[in-house]
Amino acid sequence: MSKGFKYFIKSKSFNFAKDLNNKKQNISSISWNNKQVFYRTSTSDMTLIYEILLQPKYKSEYFFPIEVNPKVIFDIGGNIGITAIYLSALFPEAKIYSFEPMSENFEILKKNIQYYENIQAFNIGLGSKNGNFKIYLSNDLENYGGTSFYPDPTGNKLESYVECEVKNINDIIKKLNLDSIDLIKIDTEGAEYDILTSLEEKFLHKTSWVSGELHGNRDFELLNYLEGLGFSISLNKEIDNRLFMFNAGKKAIISKLSRKTIKSL
């Protein structure tokens, strides 16, 4: 089955499938939950929509158990806001904070969250330090999610970069006057270890669920760190792929999950 046909079947939109081959990278949109979702044609934006919004719950790229029932969510690496609006649909009573340092992504993120009052977005990255840092751009001009804080993440040196603002994650939490983060989604192209290990442990002790993608930078050190804080870990990794998804849940939440849910992790 061709990629275009898969996109058509899931989206029920001929225009969405056709946009896979629209190399002009125009801003287009698709209806989801009776709201418009904006994206750049023929880019990784469309992959995000397909893998997160258009898949059944247990096959979506990220899995967030309803049993978590979060009040506060951090979407770290917000990209164009696809995960944020997915989280808003799952947890309409939660307050969602989305952080995206790339201005080009952020402009589309703002358009996508305009219909969701429980999402607040920030055009910054999170990390252990405050400052402006280089973010290297993918050599694949259609991949707007393949940025990296590291110039040589895969053995193919990245030449192009932009400078983006990064804020210390603990400073941001204090500024927002938060005393807990119930759920964290993180996909920061290799900065996951730096971000989560710099987060004050008192917050992670109160966090019920962390879900994200890891990129080959101290990944298993991070998972071991989370395990030491009381998280149980599940991961889905292919032996020849440095990228993989993971879920980390506190035992109190996992004990509430059904057998079907646990098998899907």
Feature-to-residue mapping (PLM):
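Phosphate/nucleotide-binding beta-alpha loop and adjacent structural elements of enzyme active sites
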Residues: 1-265
